[in-house]
């Protein structure tokens, strides 16, 4: 089986359907003895240019190992699903399991905010003890 990176963008009005779509695609891959190495739901993001007069879309990234038949099935599903604005399926040489730069940046921001909050709590406690 080969390794693939799949990115698809969903119409922003259909964002509530994304978890169900992901579940269907995961089931199709695992039923064909495939593996999902990485699955990231990036949420709504700004588009680089308008698509069908839309400026935002819901992004999903998957790195999978699956037979060609499943990939063909996913491609057909993407093509005939009106909620999917764009999709890209690329074959990769190896399984990619590490977090994408998008997720790494998000985690760093969360960590920075958490550290800032911890520092503020320490400052608040110090001020309270001085009074």
UniProtKB/Swiss-Prot annotation:
- Could you state one GO cellular component term attached to this entry? cytosolic small ribosomal subunit
Source taxon at top rank: Bacteria
Q: Which InterPro entries match?
A: Ribosomal_bS6 (IPR000529), Ribosomal_bS6_CS (IPR020815), Ribosomal_bS6_sf (IPR035980), Ribosomal_S6_plastid/chlpt (IPR020814), Transl_elong_EF1B/ribsomal_bS6 (IPR014717)
BP terms from Gene Ontology:
translation
Per UniProt, the keywords (alphabetical) are:
Ribonucleoprotein, Ribosomal protein, RNA-binding, rRNA-binding
Q: Basic and acidic residues bias: where?
A: 104-114
- Annotated Gene Ontology MF terms? small ribosomal subunit rRNA binding; structural constituent of ribosome
User: Where is the region Disordered?
Assistant: 97-131
Q: Which Pfam families does the UniProt entry name for this protein?
A: Ribosomal_S6
Amino acid composition bias (Acidic residues), ranges on this chain: 115-131
Is Ribonucleoprotein among the key words of this record? yes
Its job: Binds together with bS18 to 16S ribosomal RNA.
* Family designation: Belongs to the bacterial ribosomal protein bS6 family.
Report what the protein is called. Small ribosomal subunit protein bS6
Gene that produces this protein:
rpsF
């Amino acid at each position: 089986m080969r390794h693939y990176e799949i990115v698809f963008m969903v119409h922003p009005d259909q964002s509530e359907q994304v978890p169900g779509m992901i579940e269907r695609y995961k089931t199709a891959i695992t039923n064909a003895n495939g593996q999902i190495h990485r699955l990231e739901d990036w949420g709504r993001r700004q588009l680089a240019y308008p698509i069908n007069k839309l400026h935002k879309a819901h992004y999903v990234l998957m790195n999978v190992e699956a037979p060609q038949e499943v990939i063909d099935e996913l491609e057909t599903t993407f093509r005939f699903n009106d909620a999917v604005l764009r999709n890209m399926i690329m074959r990769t040489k190896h399984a990619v399991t590490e977090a994408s730069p998008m997720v790494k940046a998000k985690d760093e921001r969360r960590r920075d905010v958490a550290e800032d909050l911890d520092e503020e709590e320490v400052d608040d406690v110090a001020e309270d003890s001085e009074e």
